[in-house]
Curated annotation (Swiss-Prot):
UniProt subcellular location: Nucleus
Ranges in coiled-coil conformation: none
Tissue: Highly expressed in young panicles. Expressed at low levels in leaf sheaths, nodes, internodes and axillary buds.
Name of the encoding gene: CWZF5
Entry-linked Gene3D superfamilies: 3.30.40.100
Cross-referenced InterPro entries: CWZF3/5/7, THD_CWZF3/5/7, Znf_CW
Native organism: Oryza sativa subsp. japonica
Keyword Nucleotide-binding: no
Zinc fingers classed as CW-type: ranges: 645-698
Domain notes: The CW-type zinc finger domain is not required for nuclear localization.
Protein name per its UniProtKB record: Cysteine-tryptophan domain-containing zinc finger protein 5
């Protein structure tokens, strides 16, 4: 039987022939294409013998394998069709089935095999008899792709799996085993054996290593079964190799992918079906000159430090930058590495699982800037710079289309800028120390300012004046000016031939090399010579850093604008500190010093300026002026108080009708298309028509949308405010740091065209320039600031006839959106209060934004504020170093976006010690009915608040030794809630401070001559809405809303302090209110605060003699070291005078009425304690710790002024006690810091937020973070996470200290602002939380996530100043204690805020559907979350969209903290109840009280750790 079977099988095998062509080796004959025909050779029968024995089941294996091998072949179909049509083959297969079944049935094998013949065609099987026919079955010819003949070995009784021999290609791809040589020989013998008359048609290689398989395994091998038992257990080898052997390598997806990726392609391109331009998206372009991005500023370098940090990354609108040569002694500008910022650097979200976020390094000194250090590059001489530029040019061309990514994602491509410097270091040729630059601007620059940049300038090339400049160190070209670029292509701009677009100081600033991909050159002048011997102390360097610090918010710098004459305000701002950093050796830095402009001629920017040798001397530096040490210029530091970021009006201009439309509050015009028309307006249904006037749409917006009230008590339009503010780069940078709302696209937000109504906003620009070049004559007297710098000052008699006329014209011409740059000729800039557009149509709500006139100021504030800057002012700023970087505010504002204007005005919290503040005098606004009372006794000052014409006698006129009346609000504004001050006391606000030097603003008579000038009174009905009484409409009462309590909340920090010292001359000449002011009398032994009852005019200081001015310290050098109090005054010797700060909780400091106000005047030692009768909270506490109401005069020199006030009627007007002025300038006189009580919280310790403490905490936090990194590198993850979390807590603590000063502004000198610090800290806390989760420390993770929530909510709080107002609204609503609670409950407002009833009230007041929140089960069960929701939705929808990212992060942190907490609960033991209670308390704690939260967190950590080690 065995022999017969073998014989039959051999015959069957030999009967198979391959007729045709075969490809490849015999073992893989014709696998890929039909190479021939298969036929069953008729060799005389299947063996001639009998029966079933002639049919060997192994033939079935052969056939099966043929099928299986060809299963995935394209020949399979043809093969099956051919086989199925052949009867003989059917007979053979039927016989095989019967023979093969031998004891195995389909039932036994299971349905998965589908009956053994499931692989066969469904033809009727032939009876067994046919299969036993003596004649062999002949397989008809058919195409075959490949064969897999398997011949069993002689020793094997059962079927064996024989592996097909594959061609070389399959061997290479799938690495299949090949038979050993013995196997090959053996198979060859098998093929050649047999009857000689029969020749083998095919050569078969058999793998003798295959294991024996049962029938089920065979079927499984055919792919008919995926059962692991058959395919894996029975034949592990087959199961592993089967997929490989059955797929064609070129048809498998994996194979295709391998072919795509493993073969090198010429050019390094990836073989991919994707378009090449799509693949390029993966590539990141790098700035060509990145390696030159350059050195951190050196403490010894004075000039560069001022500008080195201003990079295009900070200001997204760097449309163009020009390459400047760097001087031998100057350092290259370096680009701070920004964290990404979304803003915040688009902070890595807390959900981000990436690497540990890098928190910006915070400098050891709080005043120093901590931009991440970039690799220092060598200083390049002029020649070296030229060579480098030439070398760079080629790469610039190559990188022409590359994106130079800065923070603002500004896309710019410069082909090349070739700078040639001619003997820049040669003073003989250039006596001014200026380098003549011939800048060949190859204008292949394609500037694309992303929408986020906020500066797609719409202005036409003839309106370049309106084009804002993003940073002081950057030149900007409007994309719209491409035409002018083309015209100027290849044009050589000579320093003498083109008006300077930068102040001489500006020339010094380095242009950011990386963001524009170009190198920078400093053309300021012989910086090497000037810097020689002018080393700046470390303190100065840190102060520089302070000013240079840039946050990478997508916010453009709001404080810099390009002046119409091409000057860049930003650069002027750089020198805000009394030109401390000016090259004082240059007598006058005139326009000869030409900043190679970015190819735009002066015409481009000034709308047709003198292109010839028209010289602009932005600032004349007195050569004799001493370079005051930074230590003595602390006042300037204070003057650089950062403008608080406040909701600003966003405007959009219709491209069709050229009409400006006010956007709803919170809506950013960046979201609008570049081409915008009135018809696209959707927020005012039915008013999307160009036929409607601007006023109509504006009024509609005012009516429909709640106008955010100035948050920091800063009158929005304060000219002085903005002017001084704008003057400092610090302010500009700080504004960015504060995360002010992004300026809307320049195309949408630029001020209305200058000549919109035929009025030239800069009619006197040329005249001003000429005046600057020529010395001031006639009316102007030179005022020497303590810094030794001189400024021209108009000794004008403040008759506002001209001012009023101009102002009316401006209003008529609807230049409301512009700053009025045409102040009266005789009005010095320092007295100019507000240039912002007073809205004739806007309601009072709108008023704060457009005018510095507080509602109380009524009609009068405007003239002084509107036209304050006169030509004399221009000369002052332009020609005097004393202005220290003060740029011409008129020019500034005209070029600023409306939103920027508003912000600047709003953020002008820092009173500038420069002329504007040096000469600040108290502007007292008299009520309308009391105009007649302007006559003042020489020693008497009538402070009229209401119709009650009450006068306050300055019984003890305090003699002022050497100080002019300077109101100096210290950086303290930053530390204290400016919004409260400004909100409550717009007059006391910084803007008002600038308007009213002392913040002491008595109401003016509505009938005063200047009252007619103001348009603020025109919309009385709207004003009425916000006023409590008509009297208040003209009183100096603060800006009012319908809710009086609302104002009270903001009044908490009305600590405005003013030195009210009137010079004896002015006192004697008290007849003219306009001349009267608060000044320090130099001749007397006692400082006598004289409150002059000037009308709305800002008192100019005519009374001061030149000599007096020289003696007087205008606070230019005053040190505002009282961060918490914000007011510090130094005498001539730089000694700090006592600082007096008052917090008036009532609407105003009682000036009239029943309350008697005794103000202690400063004694010899400068000790002054204000005593207020209005409220206990109004008492100012001195840092000395003495009782606020007690004054202990040292020498009996303290004099009291009795001021009777009626708090109820005088809401809003506050007379802050005059700052004490040191009589002798004794060094012993120490400045005393006063802390303003916060309404909600106890007064913060005076030293809590001092730079020393904050700096120490920052250093500790940074060191801990670095230690954490090192530990993590060593593998100690848990300890690393613990230390990192400790660093987070310290960062939060520092942020809370900074927060104490002012909610909407960051500390003036701080290297980082509060918002950014909170954001970065939240990111770091998120990292710590994820680490704790990974380490299964769920309690710690819950605490870390809580910190994430707090940090991001605080960041959102700071990013949107409107939160302040809404927060106060929440607090006001919370005043009504819930049932069962007394109003005097010890529960804080924050706790009340979390009360469900309070939330419901607030939500309803904000127009939200309370029912929606009530229906939320989470809200109902989680009061804390409801508090967050109330806060989040306390804005209108547009504001909500802006802050959605931060709030999302905060809520994510809340959710994860709860999740981690529950995970912790699931694994704790009973003895850990204390830890649970503390943890619960922390998680439910409000984010407002950061310090309290930190204490709870530390306590909770101690408890958790203690329980862990029990």
């Amino acid at each position: 039987m065995g022999g017969g079977r073998r014989g039959g099988r051999r015959e069957a095998e030999e009967g198979v022939a391959v007729a045709g062509r075969s490809r490849g080796v015999a073992a893989a004959a014709a696998r890929h294409e039909v190479a021939g025909e298969l036929e069953l050779a008729s060799a005389g029968g299947l063996g001639g013998g009998g029966g079933d024995e002639l049919v060997d089941p192994d033939q079935l294996t052969y056939i099966h394998n043929v099928f299986k091998i060809d299963l995935y072949s394209h020949v399979l179909v043809n093969l099956l069709v051919t086989i199925c049509k052949d009867e003989k083959l059917q007979n053979i297969l039927g016989h095989f089935q019967k023979e093969f079944e031998g004891g195995v049935s389909a039932e036994n094998l299971g349905s998965q095999y589908g009956g053994y013949g499931s692989f066969l065609p469904t033809y009727q099987r032939s009876p067994p008899a046919l299969s036993q026919s003596g004649s062999p079955a002949v397989l008809p010819n058919h195409g075959s792709a490949s064969r897999s003949p398997y011949i069993p070995l002689e020793s094997v009784q059962k079927n064996h799996f024989v592996k097909q021999a594959i061609d070389g290609r399959r061997k290479n791809n799938y690495c299949q085993r090949t038979s050993s040589e013995n196997d090959s020989n053996h198979s060859q013998q098998l093929l050649n054996s047999g009857p000689e008359q029969k020749t083998a048609k095919i050569r078969i290689k058999v793998n003798n290593k295959c294991l024996e398989r049962n029938n089920a395994a065979i079927y499984s091998g055919l792919g008919l079964d995926i059962s692991p038992s058959s395919s894996i257990d029975d034949s592990p080898q087959w199961s592993i190799e089967a997929p490989e052997s059955k797929l064609f390598p070129d048809e498998s997806a994996d194979t295709i992918f391998q072919i795509m990726t493993c073969h090198s392609v010429p050019g390094g391109l990836l073989l991919s079906p994707l378009a090449e331009n799509v693949l390029e998206l993966r590539q990141k372009s790098t700035a060509v000159t990145k390696k030159h991005e350059a050195p951190v500023y050196d403490n010894d370098k004075e000039e560069l430090q001022r500008n080195c940090c201003h990079t295009s990354s900070a200001a997204p609108d760097n449309n163009y930058q020009l390459v400047k040569k760097i001087k031998l002694d100057e350092q290259r500008d370096h680009l701070p590495e920004f964290e990404n910022s979304k803003y915040r650097h688009k902070n890595a979200t807390i959900m981000k699982k990436g690497a540990k976020p890098e928190l910006k390094d915070i400098s050891d000194e709080i005043d120093s800037i901590r931009a991440p250090r970039c690799a220092k590059t060598e200083k390049h001489a002029v020649g070296e710079s030229a060579d480098f530029i030439a070398d760079t040019s080629g790469r610039l061309k190559e990188a022409k289309n590359g994106q130079f990514k800065g923070k603002g994602s500004t896309q710019s491509s410069l082909s090349i800028i070739d700078v040639k410097a001619a003997n820049s270091a040669n003073d003989d040729k250039h006596p001014k120390g200026k380098a003549k630059l011939k800048v060949t601007l190859v204008r292949n620059a394609k500037m694309e300012s992303s929408l986020d940049d906020g500066f797609s300038h719409k202005t036409k090339s003839d309106k370049c004046n309106d084009q804002p400049v993003t940073t002081s160190s950057q030149l900007q070209i409007d994309p719209a000016k491409k035409t002018s670029l083309k015209r100027d292509r290849g044009k050589v701009v000579c320093a003498k031939d083109e008006p300077s677009q930068y102040k001489s100081k500006e020339l010094r600033s380095l242009v950011d090399a990386e963001s524009m991909g170009t190198t920078t050159e400093n053309v300021a002048g012989n910086s090497s010579e000037l810097l020689k011997g002018k080393k700046v102390s470390a303190l100065q360097a840190s102060l520089f850093g302070k000013k240079l610090k840039i946050k990478t918010h997508k916010k453009p710098n709001y404080d810099t604008t390009r002046k119409p004459n091409g000057e860049n305000e930003g650069y002027v701002l750089d020198h805000r500190n009394g030109s401390t950093y000016l090259h004082t050796e240059d007598k006058s830095l005139k326009t000869e010093k030409e900043s190679a402009t970015s190819g735009l001629t002066d015409k481009d920017f000034s709308g047709g300026g003198n292109d010839g040798d028209h010289k602009i001397s932005p600032i004349v530096v007195d050569k004799s002026a001493s370079m005051p040490s930074r230590c003595k210029n602390e006042t300037t530091e204070a003057s650089m108080a950062v403008p608080a970021s406040e909701p600003v009006d966003q405007w959009v201009c219709c491209d069709k009708c050229e009409t400006w439309r006010l956007l709803p509050y919170g809506m950013n015009s960046d979201t609008l298309p570049k081409k915008w028309r009135c018809s696209m307006q959707s927020w005012l249904p039915g008013m999307n028509n160009c036929k409607l006037s601007e006023g109509e749409t504006t009024n509609a917006i005012r009516a429909l949308y709640v106008v955010p009230i100035p948050e920091n008590n800063i009158s929005l339009d304060s000219r002085c405010d903005t002017a001084t503010l704008v003057r400092s780069n610090d302010a500009a940078i700080m504004s960015d740091n504060l995360g002010m709302p992004e300026i809307s696209k320049s195309s949408k937000k630029l001020h209305a065209p200058r000549n919109r109504d035929g009025l030239d906003c800069f009619p006197k620009l040329k005249e001003k320039q000429k005046r600057i070049e020529s010395s001031d004559k006639g009316e102007k007297s030179t005022v020497t600031i303590s810094s030794g710098q001189t400024m021209a000052k108009d000794r004008m008699h403040r008759k506002r006839k001209t001012s009023g006329a101009d102002y009316d014209n401006l209003i008529a011409s609807k230049k409301l959106k512009k700053v009025y740059n045409e102040p009266p000729k005789h009005q010095p800039p320092q007295f100019e209060l507000s240039k912002s557009r007073p809205s004739t149509k806007g309601s009072l709500k709108e008023l704060p934004k457009h005018t510095n006139i507080s509602p109380g100021m009524g009609k009068h504030a405007l003239p002084s504020s509107g036209k304050q800057f006169c030509d004399g002012d221009n000369s002052d700023r332009g020609a005097r170093a004393s202005d220290a970087g003060k740029s011409d505010p008129r020019d500034l504002f005209i070029k600023k976006n409306k939103s920027k204007q508003m912000q600047l005005r709003q953020h002008g919290p820092d009173p500038r010690p420069s002329d504007a503040f040096a000469k600040h005098v108290v502007k007292e606004v008299l009520s309308e009915s009391n105009a007649a009372k302007e006559k003042l006794g020489s020693d008497l000052k009538f402070l009229k608040v209401d119709d009650h014409e009450k006068s306050a006698h300055a019984r003890g006129p305090v003699t002022g030794t050497n100080s002019n009346a300077i109101f100096s609000e210290k950086e303290d504004l930053i530390e204290q809630h400016l919004e409260n001050i400004h909100f409550q006391h717009p007059l006391l606000s910084e803007s008002s401070v600038r308007r009213n030097i002392c913040n002491v603003q008595a109401s003016t008579a509505a009938t005063s001559s200047s009252s007619k000038v103001s348009s603020s009174h025109k919309n009385k009905p709207e004003f009425q809405e916000t006023r409590t009484s008509p009297v208040e409409s003209v009183s100096s009462s603060p800006l009012r809303t319908s809710d009086k309590k609302h104002l009270d909340r903001h009044r908490t920090n009305s600590y405005a302090v003013a030195e009210i010292v009137h010079s004896q001359e002015s006192v004697k000449t008290g007849a003219s209110c306009s001349k009267e002011k608060y000044g320090f009398e130099c001749g007397s032994d006692h400082t006598k605060p004289h409150v002059s009852g000037c009308s709305n005019r800002v008192m100019h200081q005519d009374a001061l003699e030149d000599g007096d001015l020289d003696k007087q310290n205008i606070l230019t050098n005053g040190v505002f070291n009282n961060r918490s109090s914000g007011l510090g005054i130094r005498n001539d010797q730089g000694q700090p005078n006592s600082l007096v700060e008052q917090k008036v909780n009532s609407h105003v400091l009682p000036i009239h009425g029943s309350g008697d106000f005794r103000r202690p005047t400063p004694d010899q030692n400068g000790k002054t304690l204000p005593q207020y009768n209005s409220n206990q909270s109004d008492q100012a506490k001195l840092s000395s710790g003495k009782h606020p109401t007690q004054v202990r005069p040292d020498k009996g020199n303290v004099e009291y002024i009795d001021l009777k006030t009626n708090p109820s009627t005088v809401a809003g007007s506050k007379l802050l006690p005059g700052l004490n002025n040191k009589v002798n300038g004794n060094a012993s006189n120490k400045s005393k810091q006063s802390v303003v009580e916060n309404m909600k919280h106890a007064a913060i310790h005076v030293d809590a937020s001092t730079p020393i403490n904050a700096s120490a905490l920052l250093k500790e936090a940074r060191d801990l973070k670095h230690l954490s990194d090192r530990l993590k590198g060593k593998g100690d993850d848990l300890e690393s996470a613990n230390i990192c979390f400790e660093a987070c807590l310290k960062f939060l603590h520092v942020a809370s200290l900074k927060e104490a000063a002012g909610v909407d502004s960051s500390k003036q000198g701080d290297p980082i602002n509060t918002m950014t610090l909170y954001s970065d800290t939240g990111n770091l806390c998120g990292f710590c939380a994820r680490e704790f989760e990974r380490l299964k420390k769920m309690a710690n993770a819950a605490l870390a996530y809580k910190c994430v929530e707090v940090a991001y909510m605080k960041a959102a709080f700071y990013k949107h100043p409107g939160a302040i107002k809404d927060s106060h609204a929440l607090q006001a609503a919370s005043v009504i204690a819930p049932p069962a609670e007394s109003p005097s409950s010890s529960a804080s407002d924050v706790d009340n805020l979390n009360n469900p009833s309070t939330i419901a009230k607030i939500v309803s007041t904000r127009g939200l559907c309370t029912s929606q929140i009530a229906k939320n089960p989470i809200s109902r069960s989680n009061h804390h979350l409801m508090g967050l929701l109330a806060y989040s939705f306390s804005y209108d929808p547009f504001c909500l969209l802006d802050k959605v990212e931060d709030t999302n992060y905060a809520f994510e942190g809340t959710r994860k903290s709860q999740s981690a907490f529950f995970s912790y609960l699931s694994g704790i033991e009973k003895d850990q109840a204390d830890g649970i209670a503390l943890l619960t308390e922390v998680l439910n704690f409000s984010f407002h009280n950061v310090k309290g939260l930190l204490q709870l967190i530390r306590h909770s950590l101690e408890c958790i750790n203690h329980e862990r080690f029990k």
